[in-house]
């Protein structure tokens, strides 16, 4: 999100802002939101991954079938891998789908990919295939597949990396 006073991008987006900006999400699934924090993704550390793991476990124990983690793109690949490895550390698999998503462009820009990525992530979390423990299906990352709207890619959470700072594919 852009701070229009300074012109700088800030890490201050509230969950309700995401839902209000994307009302079609509520038509996809029953949504419950938990805010774990607002920070730059490159400030993520192992204790943050533990918090994400705990929140996922709590959500699954409360009956959630899928989870969407909204995350900055700079270190999303580290977090999606950490969560996948965290679940498999004891030879287990998550009881449902865990989807990471974000946006290459600020959510308040007209060219933002945040809405489409979030909608695709919610759809996958709600209706995607059952997690079976195959390599790479414990967590997935869903982002734009090309620079055009209309198609999102579903990628293994342990096999992704950021290729560009603002390009949408």
Question: Whereabouts are the PLM-identified features?
Answer:
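Active-site histidine-anchored catalytic micro-motif
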Residues: 1-169
């Amino acid at each position: 999100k852009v701070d229009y006073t300074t012109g700088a991008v800030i890490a201050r987006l509230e969950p309700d802002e995401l839902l209000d900006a994307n009302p079609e999400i509520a038509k996809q699934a029953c949504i419950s939101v938990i805010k774990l924090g607002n920070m730059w993704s490159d400030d993520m550390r192992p204790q943050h991954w533990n918090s994400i793991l705990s929140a996922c476990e709590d959500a699954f124990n409360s009956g959630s079938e899928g989870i969407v983690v909204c995350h900055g793109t700079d270190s999303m690949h580290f977090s999606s891998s950490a969560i996948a490895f965290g679940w498999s550390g004891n030879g287990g698999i998550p009881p449902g789908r865990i989807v990471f998503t974000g946006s290459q462009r600020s959510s308040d820009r007209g060219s933002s990919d945040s809405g489409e990525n979030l909608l695709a992530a919610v759809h996958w979390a709600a209706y995607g295939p059952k997690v079976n423990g195959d390599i790479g299906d414990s967590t997935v990352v869903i982002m734009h597949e090309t620079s055009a709207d209309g198609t999102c890619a579903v990628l293994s959470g342990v096999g992704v990396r950021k290729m560009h700072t603002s390009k949408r594919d």
